[in-house]
């Protein structure tokens, strides 16, 4: 029987139905223009773009231009790629243009969909950013979809790591720019550390289309992007603390796996105190509870977390003497990404690899706050509905489920739950053998590298050929995914979220053609393609007859969305398929969330070894547990955002002020205002209002003026005059300072003085902001304890954060004023000394760039092997990543030939 809610939906339709219905008339308008645009020549398509650009840039609403722009783009894609966009793809493009998240199933052509809103919004001339999850996809999509934009007379750029600023500037100035979320965020931070407008790379934040939007805006929302510099070396402390960790007994610590946190118990603190005192780290008489012990306690906690909560091959791998993190949502290696607060160093000590120094934050931003900079934001994904509330609340984005072009024919079976992991894996192997026997391609989903490799060993014992895709095989990813739909293929993969490459039944035609032509360059491309397409059609039919792709998952993820993404790999474009989850009561999700109750139920039912329970109730129970985890994670992200918003408001104020200074030719007024405020502060501090003259601290004011303003003024004499008040002394100091600074400007020349003032302002802003970030981080780490005193940590953080910000601004004014007051022109002798040092530096740089001219003892070329040939990399030995490239390009090795290493 239908409930009242379901009955209402039947009568009135769901909000999603209404949104889809409202887009249909626009799709019809685009379809009505199709024949008209098909009749246009290639030059006419570009001419249409120029006409639409003129209308958009003269103020015409983009919504009015949509039908013509979409029709033009559809025709360009048909000519450039041989792809005609379906109505559902046009609909997805409409929702993206309107600033929504378009939920489109795997295989529905999201890459092509993005070109429609990108083209329409690029007509405004402000640039559009299409955001992908990795560099491979950014380059692939820019090259592939760039053909469509070229057909339309528009430029395409791609941004990736290690480009120089000139290349990045050019990419950002293109009409449409493809980039990863990481690179966009880092470029934003780097731009706000530049010394002039000309050095900046980005040109604003107008419109972004985020692919795999749930992965970027939700899974990575808690990870800030940080540009940092090295701090003091504490490697010995990490090693000493790490040595104690294996000695910890269960009563020494308490684990909270749900929150991924660990704390020492009372017994643990006593154990730690004794060990630290014996090792000489904790001085005699000092306890862990003393304020001086804060750093030691913090690093001991991190060492324990490294041992008890971070597992090798699940959370990280060790490669080339380095701990490389693994993204738990996508299974990808996150090279260059490091855990903060000493946790990464603790893991390095645990694994016995080189311990890299901790870093001090120079600039940071979260993805939540970076993407909220855009005037308009939209996104695409295969799974967003489960997180619709979070998208709406944090990003003000609606989620619209776009209908599939063809009905989904995949069969999603009920989960099978076993009592032990051993029973579960035995059943998994049997299911794989059964499907493999009929040639059905199988995608086996696992949650960690360790489990994927264990399954691989089990399949090898059974003699079943298979591929493994995890962070270790990251480089072969595209090839493995392309082959996963072939007849009889078995592919084991860690989380497939955000992989970006569709699994096509029968294999990927384009990749087969490329391989065939690479193997035989003399072959006729058309003949090769015709042969491969015929073979592919036969193989695809055999796969369809076998039941399509079988997605077999070995565990539920904490997030329903990740499970749905794995399921969505099967049944693309109306193909048949099947998905099935195998679980056990020993799985992490089951163990942490209520497996005991289920175990009792299974015992009551009298289940025997190897038997599974299959029931819709189990699915619902698991989904409730997952919803609980998602809700808790949402609350954590929401709370983190509230804290980050405090810093974000301050960041925006500082970056905006910095930008204004870079844009302003004449910053003398800003420096003069700061000087006036400094003088006011000095007067108020030493000659307080409503204080009698005999209560004034005249000597203190005299010394402060010498220190801050670099002038020895007769303040004692002024204070002794009859009828002199604070305002008179303030005015005299101000006049003397103005005259002193005017004299400096004359000595340097007006143009030089302008440059000096600008550089001093920017340097001091950067320096103060860096110090302020460290202070805010410290405040953030301790403010949580205020909750024990019945005070709201967030309110305390806001209040104290604002006070710290005001203190920073006061310090900024004082330091800028002091530095400008102390500068002076160089003497001739100093200028000659500087010139000599500069020439010496230049000579050293030249020698580094061309070391073949610099011979060491024994006639060997310094830094290179004997028999060196700059055109032959085999003679280069092993250059360090940061050495100049031996080819003589002048670039660092890692940015030149080292890219290929």
Curated annotation (Swiss-Prot):
Cofactor descriptive note:
May bind 1 zinc ion per subunit.
Q: Where in the cell is it found?
A: Cell inner membrane; Cytoplasm
Q: Which cofactor does it need?
A: Zn(2+)
**GO BP, one annotated term:** protein targeting
Q: Which reaction does it catalyse?
A: ATP + H2O + cellular proteinSide 1 = ADP + phosphate + cellular proteinSide 2
Q: Name one GO molecular function term.
A: protein-exporting ATPase activity
Its Gene Ontology cellular component terms are: cell envelope Sec protein transport complex; cytosol; plasma membrane
The record gives the membrane topology as:
Peripheral membrane protein
Region Disordered: start and end of each range?
A: 838-883
Q: What is its main location?
A: membrane
Q: Which Pfam families match?
A: P-loop_SecA, SEC-C, SecA_DEAD, SecA_PP_bind, SecA_SW
**Key word Cell inner membrane present in the record?**
yes
Which residues are ATP-binding?
89, 107-111, 502
Residues reported in the UniProt entry to bind Zn(2+): 885, 887, 896-897
Q: What is its EC number?
A: 7.4.2.8
Q: NCBIfam families given for it?
A: PRK12904.1, secA
Summarizing the function annotation, the protein's role is:
Part of the Sec protein translocase complex. Interacts with the SecYEG preprotein conducting channel. Has a central role in coupling the hydrolysis of ATP to the transfer of proteins into and across the cell membrane, serving both as a receptor for the preprotein-SecB complex and as an ATP-driven molecular motor driving the stepwise translocation of polypeptide chains across the membrane.
Q: What does the sequence similarity comment in the record state about its family?
A: Belongs to the SecA family.
Q: What is this protein called?
A: Protein translocase subunit SecA
What organism does the UniProt record list as the source? Paracoccus denitrificans (strain Pd 1222)
């Amino acid at each position: 029987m239908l409930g009242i809610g379901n009955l209402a939906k039947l009568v009135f339709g769901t909000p999603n139905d209404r949104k889809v219905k409202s887009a249909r008339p626009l799709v019809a308008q685009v379809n009505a223009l199709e024949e008209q645009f098909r009749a246009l020549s290639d030059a006419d398509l570009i001419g249409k773009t120029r006409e639409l650009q003129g209308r958009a840039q003269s103020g015409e609403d983009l919504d009015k231009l949509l039908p013509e722009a979409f029709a033009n783009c559809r025709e360009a894609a048909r000519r450039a790629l041989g792809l005609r966009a379906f109505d559902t793809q046009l609909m997805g493009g409409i929702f993206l243009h309107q600033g929504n998240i378009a939920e489109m199933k795997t295989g529905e052509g999201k890459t092509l969909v993005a070109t429609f809103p990108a083209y329409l919004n690029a007509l405004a001339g402000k640039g559009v950013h299409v955001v992908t999850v990795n560099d491979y996809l950014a380059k692939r999509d820019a090259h592939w979809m760039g053909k469509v934009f070229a057909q339309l007379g528009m430029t395409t750029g791609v941004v990736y790591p290690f480009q120089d600023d000139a290349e990045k500037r050019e990419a950002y100035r293109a009409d449409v720019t493809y980039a990863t979320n990481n690179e966009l965020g880092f470029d934003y931070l780097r731009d706000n550390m530049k010394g002039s407008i000309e050095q900046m790379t980005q040109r604003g934040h107008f419109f972004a289309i985020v692919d795999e939007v749930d992965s970027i805006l939700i899974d990575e929302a808690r990870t800030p992007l940080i540009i940092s510099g090295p701090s003091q070396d504490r490697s010995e402390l990490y090693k000493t603390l790490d040595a104690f960790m294996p000695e910890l007994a269960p009563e020494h610590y308490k684990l909270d796996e749900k929150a991924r946190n660990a704390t020492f118990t009372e017994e643990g603190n006593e154990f730690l105190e004794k060990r630290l005192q014996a090792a000489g780290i904790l001085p005699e008489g000092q306890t862990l509870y003393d304020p001086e012990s804060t750093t030691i306690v913090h690093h001991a906690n991190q060492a324990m977390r490294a041992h008890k909560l971070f597992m090798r091959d699940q959370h990280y791998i060790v490669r080339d003497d380095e701990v490389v993190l693994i993204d738990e949502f996508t299974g990808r290696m996150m090279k260059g990404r490091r855990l903060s607060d000493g946790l990464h160093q603790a893991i390095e000590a645990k694994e016995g690899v080189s311990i890299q120094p901790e870093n001090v934050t120079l600039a940071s931003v979260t993805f939540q706050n970076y993407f909220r900079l855009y005037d308009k934001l939209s996104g695409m994904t295969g799974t967003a509905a489960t997180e619709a509330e979070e998208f709406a609340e944090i990003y003000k984005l609606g989620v619209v489920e776009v209908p599939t072009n063809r009905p989904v024919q995949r069969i999603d079976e009920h989960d099978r739950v076993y009592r032990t992991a051993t029973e579960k894996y035995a059943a998994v192997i049997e299911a794989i053998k059964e499907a493999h026997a009929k040639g059905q391609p199988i995608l086996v989903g696992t949650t960690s590298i360790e489990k994927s490799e264990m399954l691989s060993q089990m399949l090898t014992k059974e003699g079943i050929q298979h591929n493994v895709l995890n962070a270790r095989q990251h480089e072969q990813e595209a090839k493995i995914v392309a082959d996963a739909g072939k007849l009889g293929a078995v592919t084991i993969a860690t989380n497939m979220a955000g992989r970006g490459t569709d699994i096509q039944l029968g294999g990927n035609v384009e990749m087969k053609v490329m391989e065939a032509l690479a193997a035989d360059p003399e072959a006729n491309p058309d003949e090769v393609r015709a042969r491969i397409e015929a073979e592919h059609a036969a193989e695809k039919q055999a796969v369809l007859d076998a039941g399509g792709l079988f997605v077999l998952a070995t565990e539920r993820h904490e997030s329903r969305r990740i499970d749905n993404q794995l399921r969505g790999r099967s049944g693309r474009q109306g193909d048949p398929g099947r998905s099935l989850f195998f679980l056990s009561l020993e799985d992490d999700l089951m163990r942490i969330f209520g497996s005991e109750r289920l175990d009792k139920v299974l015992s009551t039912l009298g289940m025997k070894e190897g038997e599974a329970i299959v029931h819709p109730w189990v699915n619902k129970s698991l989904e409730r547990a997952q919803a609980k985890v998602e809700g808790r994670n949402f609350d954590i992200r929401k709370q983190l955002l509230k804290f980050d918003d405090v810093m974000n408001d301050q960041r925006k104020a500082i970056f905006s002020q910095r930008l204004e200074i870079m844009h302003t030719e004449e910053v003398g007024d800003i420096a003069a205002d700061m000087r006036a405020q400094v003088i006011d502060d000095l007067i108020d501090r030493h000659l307080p209002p409503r204080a009698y003259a005999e209560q004034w601290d005249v000597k203190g004011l005299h010394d402060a003026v010498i220190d801050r303003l670099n002038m020895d003024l007769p303040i004692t004499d002024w204070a002794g005059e009859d009828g002199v008040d604070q305002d008179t002394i303030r005015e005299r100091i101000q006049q003397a300072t103005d005259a002193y600074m005017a004299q400096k400007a004359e000595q340097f020349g007006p143009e030089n003085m302008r440059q000096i003032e600008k550089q001093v302002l920017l340097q001091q802003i950067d320096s103060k902001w860096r110090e302020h970030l460290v202070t805010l981080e410290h405040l953030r780490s301790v403010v949580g304890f205020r909750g024990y005193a019945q005070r709201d940590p967030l309110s305390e953080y806001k209040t104290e954060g604002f006070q710290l910000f005001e203190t920073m601004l006061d310090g900024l004014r004082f330091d800028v004023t002091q530095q400008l007051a102390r500068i002076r022109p160089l003497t001739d002798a100093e200028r000659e000394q500087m010139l000599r040092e500069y020439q010496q530096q230049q000579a050293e740089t030249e020698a580094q760039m061309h070391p073949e001219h610099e011979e060491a003892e024994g006639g060997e070329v310094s830094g290179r092997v004997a028999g060196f040939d700059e055109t032959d990399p085999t003679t280069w030995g092993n250059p360090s990543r940061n050495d100049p490239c031996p080819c003589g390009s002048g670039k660092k090795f890692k940015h030149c030939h080292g890219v290929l290493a």
